[in-house]
Amino acid sequence: MIIIVTGTPGVGKTVASKKLSETLNLNYLSLSQFVIENKLYTEYDELRQSYIIDEDKVKEELEKIISASHLVIETIYPSLISTADLVVVLRKNPFSLYNELKGRGWADIKVAENVEAEILGVISQEAREAFKDKVCEVDTTEMSTEQILNKILNKQCDGPIEWLVDTKVQRFLEELDKIISSYENDI
């Protein structure tokens, strides 16, 4: 059994994935840690404080371990994984997510790009394109780990979640775009 838990940074992937793997007695794999430990990246982006992954190498190495494993895989890149029984996309209210990421001390550009990705549903769309009806979206806003886990185990999906129906979120997206645009010369 392969379960993918995905979503933008700050939505609760790590805690939910670890708890899910423990509850279902499955192994846990953080794709980010896997990439770093196996040097499956091409460079380090100083501006965003992130590694740029080598997608081909990641896919190749994942194939070696997925075929014979029962895993919960935590990732922001669901389409790099070739197979899954369930894909859980954790989502979070963009305003809450912004506060979460700012609280981590991340650079403004990194916060803005990640919150924009959440608003636009980038990871959700990627998951749906790769896994279609195996996708379950869960809104983690103001939820405990136990509540999130319960929704996953009972396949109580909230999605597809559309943040852009809220005019406040639309205005927030415009502000995020201004932040991102201010870094254009650095990108």
UniProtKB/Swiss-Prot annotation:
Residues bound to ATP are G10, G12, K13, T14, V15, R104
The GO annotation for biological process reads: ribosomal small subunit biogenesis; rRNA processing
Q: Mind telling me which InterPro entries this protein's record contains?
A: Adenyl_kinase_AK6, P-loop_NTPase
Q: Could you list the residue ranges that cross the membrane?
A: none
**Presence of keyword Transmembrane:** no
Query: What's the catalysed reaction?
Result: AMP + ATP = 2 ADP; ATP + H2O = ADP + phosphate + H(+)
Locate the region LID. 103-113
Coiled-coil features, chain-numbered ranges: none
Q: Which GO terms describe its molecular function?
A: adenylate kinase activity; ATP binding; ATP hydrolysis activity
Write down the EC number: 2.7.4.3
- Keywords attached to this entry: ATP-binding, Kinase, Nucleotide-binding, Ribosome biogenesis, rRNA processing, Transferase
Residue ranges of region NMP?
30-53
- Top-rank taxon of the source lineage equals Archaea
Q: Does rRNA processing show up as a keyword for this record?
A: yes
Q: Name one Pfam family in it.
A: AAA_18
Q: Matching HAMAP family, A to Z?
A: Adenylate_kinase_AK6
Quaternary structure per UniProt? Interacts with uS11. Not a structural component of 40S pre-ribosomes, but transiently interacts with them by binding to uS11.
What does this protein do, in the record's words?
Answer: Broad-specificity nucleoside monophosphate (NMP) kinase that catalyzes the reversible transfer of the terminal phosphate group between nucleoside triphosphates and monophosphates. Also has ATPase activity. Involved in the late maturation steps of the 30S ribosomal particles, specifically 16S rRNA maturation. While NMP activity is not required for ribosome maturation, ATPase activity is. Associates transiently with small ribosomal subunit protein uS11. ATP hydrolysis breaks the interaction with uS11.
Q: State the family it belongs to.
A: Belongs to the adenylate kinase family. AK6 subfamily.
Query: Which protein are we looking at?
Result: Putative adenylate kinase
Tell me the lineage of the source organism. Answer: Archaea, Thermoproteota, Thermoprotei, Sulfolobales, Sulfolobaceae
